[in-house]
Design a protein with these regions (language model features):
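Extended, histidine- and acidic-residue-enriched regions that form the cofactor-binding/catalytic faces
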Residues: 121-130
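Residues that form or immediately flank small-molecule/cofactor binding pockets and catalytic motifs
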Residues: 30-32, 118-121
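A glycine-rich beta-strand to alpha-helix segment
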Residues: 50-72
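Phosphate-coordination/substrate-recognition cap region in phosphate-metabolizing enzymes
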Residues: 1-52
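Alpha-helix N-cap/helix-start capping motif
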Residues: 4-8, 59-60, 91
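Domain-level recognition of soluble alpha/beta enzyme cores
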Residues: 70-112, 116-119
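Short, well-ordered, mixed-charge alpha-helical segments that flank or form enzyme active sites
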Residues: 63-64, 105-106, 122-123
Length: 130
């Protein structure tokens, strides 16, 4: 997670769903306003035993990373999700990407975009997209 106040607040808003079994969290100053290649470098350093990885960062870097990783959609639904990301990637959007390789081999176009969720897609959300 970026060390910024906003990303910490985002994490606090999400972390309750894990209850007492919260995942390990690392705050990294390097994620603050990082460009997508720097974010990809962080992904590549994840330990191999890591099954899931969540980055909470800032636009434009986090948005550009999602685009770079999902660059080659393989199915019509994935293409539709990529088009939705291209139309608008608002603050607090979530891109879920699947990757079958070793983290150290993570590369642009190697991931599948399995979900793209904007805040307004969540039932009960009454705010505005940034």
């Amino acid at each position: 997670l970026s060390t910024s106040l906003r990303t910490r607040q985002t994490w606090e808003g999400l972390s309750f769903s894990w209850g007492k079994k919260k995942p390990k969290v690392e705050f990294q100053r390097a994620l603050y306003l990082a460009a997508w290649p720097a974010l990809l470098a962080v992904v590549k350093t994840a330990p191999e035993k890591t099954q899931s990885l969540m980055l909470i960062g800032h636009n434009p870097g986090i948005e550009q990373l999602a685009f770079a990783l999902a660059l080659k959609p393989k199915t019509p639904p994935e293409r539709t999700r990529l088009e939705a990301m291209a139309a608008k990637y608002p603050t607090a959007a979530l891109a879920v990407l699947d990757f079958d390789g070793a983290w150290k081999d993570a590369a642009a176009g190697a991931f599948q975009l399995t979900e793209f969720i904007k805040p307004k897609d969540i039932p009960g959300y009454d705010g505005e997209d940034d």
